[in-house]
Amino acid sequence: MKNYEDKVKHKCSALLKLICGIQEFYFSANSEQKRFIETTIGAAIWYLPKNNKVLFTGKISLDAIKKNEKSEDHLFPRKIAATELLNFNWNKESDPEKVLVELFLSKYGKFNYVSKFENKKLIKYQKSEVFKTPEIAYSNAGITLVDFKK
């Protein structure tokens, strides 16, 4: 576990440099540039180290159980996560790297299992214009989550 957290910390250190390095430009960028920056930071979040024991919420959809398929769905879409991170005031944090690691491990890296069909269905409810919370997105998509029993 310690080794995993070290890997996350190492990558988050680099990600934080990217975020802080682009923030000033991001705030004055036009909407097309902002979307590009958000997509790029979102992709970087995707490449942070995975560990199912740490990041899996323990929830699976009824449809995924019925179809016997597991597709990972992150509670917070990458673009939403990127936007939040780009708008975060990192200067007020005494240990911004630790904050970013914690945000990834407790929020942005977390995922449930859903069916492939549900994963596609969720897309329209996870767009930045409509996304409010993971619970609302799942409810709007008609997805019921239950505890995963191996």
Please tell me what each predicted stretch does.
Residues 66-104:
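Histidine-centered nuclease catalytic patch
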Residues 1-68, 88-89, 126-149:
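Nuclease and nuclease-like effector domains acting on nucleic acids or nucleotide cofactors
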Residues 104-130:
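Short Cys/His-centered divalent metal-binding micro-motifs
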Residues 37-38, 72, 108-111:
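Short runs of predominantly hydrophobic/aromatic residues within well-ordered alpha helices
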Residues 30, 93-94, 115:
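Residues that cap or delimit alpha-helices
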Residues 102-107, 135-137:
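A general structural signal for short secondary-structure junctions and capping/turn motifs
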